[in-house]
Structure formats: C-alpha cells, structure tokens
Amino acid sequence: MQIKFLTTLATVLTSVAAMGDLAFNLGVKNDDGTCKDVSTFEGDLDFLKSHSKIIKTYAVSDCNTLQNLGPAAEAEGFQIQLGIWPNDDAHFEAEKEALQNYLPKISVSTIKIFLVGSEALYREDLTASELASKINEIKDLVKGIKDKNGKSYSSVPVGTVDSWNVLVDGASKPAIDAADVVYSNSFSYWQKNSQANASYSLFDDVMQALQTLQTAKGSTDIEFWVGETGWPTDGSSYGDSVPSVENAADQWQKGICALRAWGINVAVYEAFDEAWKPDTSGTSSVEKHWGVWQSDKTLKYSIDCKFN
C-alpha cells in the first residue's frame, strides 16, 4: 500500500522543484488582543527572515493588517501571501477599500499573491460560484491599482485557500477555475490521526488535492502550496491526535520537511503562539498553541530538516 502511494505521488509530482519553499502564517494581534503595529511586525519579520521571507495572512482591513504589515514587509524584504476576507458584503467592501488605500503605498513585489477566502467553502460561508465571483471581482480591482512606483498589480496572481477535502469535491470547481492559484490546507490533528499515521495522512491529503488541481488546470506544471499545516504543542487531545512538543517536532520532520523534499511549498500554521485566542469547546486551549515559536519567540523544537 505504501509503495503504491509513493509511486502515485511521484507521478503527480513529476514537474515540481527539488525543494519546496517555506512560509509562515502570521498572526496580527499581540498576546493581549491588541493589534500589532508597524514596529511589532518589523520585529516579527526580522526574527523570521533567517528561516523564510514569505508570510501569509487572512484579511486586509482587520487590525489594519495591510496598512501596518505592508511597510514592515517591504522594509524587511518579505513577500506577503495576502488574505482577503470575502464572507459578508460589509467586510468585503472594507477589504477592497483597504486594498485601494494601501497597495499604492508599497511595491508590487511585496505581494506574492492575493488569496480570496480562507476555507470559505469548507465552512459553507460561500458557494463555489459565489467565491468565484469574489475572486474575479478582486482580479478586476487590482488591475486598476498601481504601486508606489506606478506599476500595476495585475501581475500578481489571485487565488484562494481551502481545505483539501473540499477541493477534491467536484462542487468546488467554479472557484478552482476562477483562481490563478489554489492553496490546500491539511491538518492530520483535526482528522484525529495517531502520531504513527499523521505524516502518511498529510501526504495522502496533499496528493489528492494536488492531483485534483492539476486535472482542473490541465497541467502538472502549476504553482501549488499547502496553505496551512502543523501540529499543536498543548491543549486537549482530539481523537487519537495528542498535542505535544514531541509530536509537533515529529510532524515537522516527517510531514513538513518531507513534503518540501518532494518539492511541495508549505505555509506552516503558524509562526508564533497566539495567547489572545479563546478556548474552543472540546479542544481546550489548542488554538493558542500552534506556533513553532512561543509568543516570546522561544523556539519549541528544531526546525532544521534532517533528511537522513
């Protein structure tokens, strides 16, 4: 079974690069729940830049994210996978207004991609057709926005992010077709996997999503990212999934490092713990503990990939 899986995976990944890129999902709030300012973001990015120079976010207007993070990212030489929240009309209008106000203040090279929605299909916030419409609306919007040097943002791809299992469902096709690039999220923890099965499950999820997207786009030569994956270091168990530093370290090596070795780009969830987050019913405190680093920037486990 494992040999068949690896053979199929190799077929799917025939055209990818030798080593996948690494990015980090980055929270926009301090431990006390207040919003990070430019200097705080600069501190975060200065700390992260020896590990990656790509970060991913979820919204533009919330916490003045683009207003504060954009200049910090440009100053530190980072690219942003910029999330845009599309789920309700008022929020979406605020997102578009923020794009129009703050994209002209930075360079187009600072934005790696616009990502419209984060698991909007998985949560059933939008239908695939509704999400496709929002993606196309952002494409039209950014074509008319120029950066601080007069360059158009039309060169920046516009995509979306959703859970792997939703992407392999045929109902997601309108959104996949509209998106220039699609990121796939996969968490073995939320699938109640034991540690022994966690990395295998992650690979299987990623393979299914990638194969679906390659088929939809009619090519194996597509840009592809795992938009979120990781393992919590504290909180309650979820089925056979047990949060711990040891298990997170194991999933980093056998899951994240291994995916990158196959040429898969991975945006890890997440850079730093977020102590401000509330407990979630049934998974007490787990949302606070997904960071590779504690909120004070103490590393929890080695993130050097060991390919031995």
From Swiss-Prot:
InterPro entries xrefs: Beta-glucan_modifiers, Glyco_hydro_17, Glycoside_hydrolase_SF
EC category: hydrolase
GO cellular component: cell surface; cytoplasm; extracellular region; extracellular vesicle; fungal-type cell wall; yeast-form cell wall
UniProt subcellular location: Secreted, Cell wall; Cytoplasm
Description of what induces expression: Induced during biofilm formation and by fluconazole and micafungin. Expression is also regulated by RCK2.
UniProt cross-references to Gene3D superfamilies, sorted A to Z: Glycosidases
Family assignment from sequence similarity: Belongs to the glycosyl hydrolase 17 family.
Described purpose of this protein according to its UniProt entry: Cell wall glucan 1,3-beta-glucosidase involved in cell wall biosynthesis and virulence. Crucial for delivery of beta-1,3-glucan to the biofilm matrix and for accumulation of mature matrix biomass. Plays a role as a major antigen in human systemic candidiasis patients.
Protein name: Glucan 1,3-beta-glucosidase BGL2
Gene: BGL2
